[in-house]
Amino acid sequence: MSSEKAQNPMRELRIQKLVLNISVGESGDRLTRAAKVLEQLSGQTPVYSKARYTVRQFGIRRNEKIAVHVTVRGPKAEEILERGLKVKEYELRRRNFSETGNFGFGISEHIDLGIKYDPSIGIYGMDFYCCMTRPGERVAKRRRCKSRIGASHRITREETIRWFKQRFDGIVR
């Protein structure tokens, strides 16, 4: 047997999903152009998000479409996350990581991701949010024979930071 202890494959962290969000703050032409940006980036059809409340100072009404987002899973999520982290130079803050082990960050210009600039679309910033999981998480999500995940199997902030540093050779401040 090797000198180091064998790692349990059920304890390995993996990316469950990556959510890309562009919040425009108004419906109309700018929102549809933002949807085109997300479609170019992910290759999937984005979903529109509606405002929950009317806020007169911002000029938005309840149920008005104000944002667009897309959920990416699998190897495509890892590839897009890699491109997003390259823009941030693999450097995140500690407060980017949540207590439940997920993390998120934002970029100011989508053209940094390698998408060619199109004058008819413009430049949009976007938010990346990455949800982490472990094998066996379906036990809590499934419909039949639902059960709880033990405290030792839940993902913590420190575990995700360790995974981020090891996987992407990243810096956490």
Curated annotation (Swiss-Prot):
Alphabetized Pfam families for the sequence: Ribosomal_L5, Ribosomal_L5_C
Protein family per UniProt: Belongs to the universal ribosomal protein uL5 family.
Keywords assigned by UniProt, alphabetized: Ribonucleoprotein, Ribosomal protein
Keyword Ribonucleoprotein in annotation: yes
Statement: the UniProt record of this protein carries the keyword Ribonucleoprotein: yes
Molecular function via GO: structural constituent of ribosome
Subunit field text: Component of a hexameric 5S RNP precursor complex, composed of 5S RNA, RRS1, RPF2, RPL5, RPL11 and SYO1; this complex acts as a precursor for ribosome assembly.
Function, in words: Component of the ribosome, a large ribonucleoprotein complex responsible for the synthesis of proteins in the cell. The small ribosomal subunit (SSU) binds messenger RNAs (mRNAs) and translates the encoded message by selecting cognate aminoacyl-transfer RNA (tRNA) molecules. The large subunit (LSU) contains the ribosomal catalytic site termed the peptidyl transferase center (PTC), which catalyzes the formation of peptide bonds, thereby polymerizing the amino acids delivered by tRNAs into a polypeptide chain.
Gene Ontology cellular-component annotations: ribonucleoprotein complex; ribosome
UniProt-listed InterPro entries: Ribosomal_uL5, Ribosomal_uL5_C, Ribosomal_uL5_CS, Ribosomal_uL5_dom_sf, Ribosomal_uL5_N
Lineage, top ranks: Eukaryota, Fungi, Dikarya, Ascomycota, Pezizomycotina
Biological process terms in GO annotation: translation
Name of the protein: Large ribosomal subunit protein uL5
